[in-house]
Amino acid sequence: MPTINQLVRKPRQMDVVKSKVPALEACPQKRGVCTRVYTTTPKKPNSALRKVAKVRLTNGFEVISYIGGEGHNLQEHSVVLIRGGRVKDLPGVRYHIVRGSLDLQGVKDRKQSRSKYGAKRPKKA
């Protein structure tokens, strides 16, 4: 155990916490342009064609982000908003694209969890 004098000379070091979403640079979201929109397969034991996009952000970072929901209208040069949040079965995908913001439309005919998919409230019959 160090003496008071030793602590005065050299204080205790705090643990440095590494960010899980470095490209956001401590911002809640960032804007970017899609450079490639494609599908990829998840790790074992899952099987699917997951929709992802490579996005060049305004700060110069190039990241892979996930497009959630059923169907999307993204193509190359679409402007999107990304947020943090990884996809557990897709290695290297640490960001999500925000639905219903900028060029990406919300999910059509979505009834539940609408706010997460940028869907408007359905009209009453």
From Swiss-Prot:
Instruction: For this entry, list what GO says about its biological process.
Output: translation
A molecular function (GO) term: structural constituent of ribosome
Spell out the Pfam families in the cross-references: Ribosom_S12_S23
The PTM 3-methylthioaspartic acid maps to 89
A GO CC annotation recorded here is: small ribosomal subunit
Q: Which UniProt keywords apply?
A: Methylation, Ribonucleoprotein, Ribosomal protein, RNA-binding, rRNA-binding, tRNA-binding
| Skewed-composition ranges (Basic residues) | 113-125
**InterPro entries in UniProt:** NA-bd_OB-fold, Ribosomal_uS12, Ribosomal_uS12_bac
Q: Which family does it belong to?
A: Belongs to the universal ribosomal protein uS12 family.
Q: Function of this protein?
A: With S4 and S5 plays an important role in translational accuracy.
Q: How does it assemble?
A: Part of the 30S ribosomal subunit. Contacts proteins S8 and S17. May interact with IF1 in the 30S initiation complex.
Give the protein name, as stated in the record.
Small ribosomal subunit protein uS12
Q: What organism, scientifically named, is this protein from? A: Azoarcus sp. (strain BH72)
Give the source lineage, highest ranks first. Bacteria, Pseudomonadati, Pseudomonadota, Betaproteobacteria, Rhodocyclales
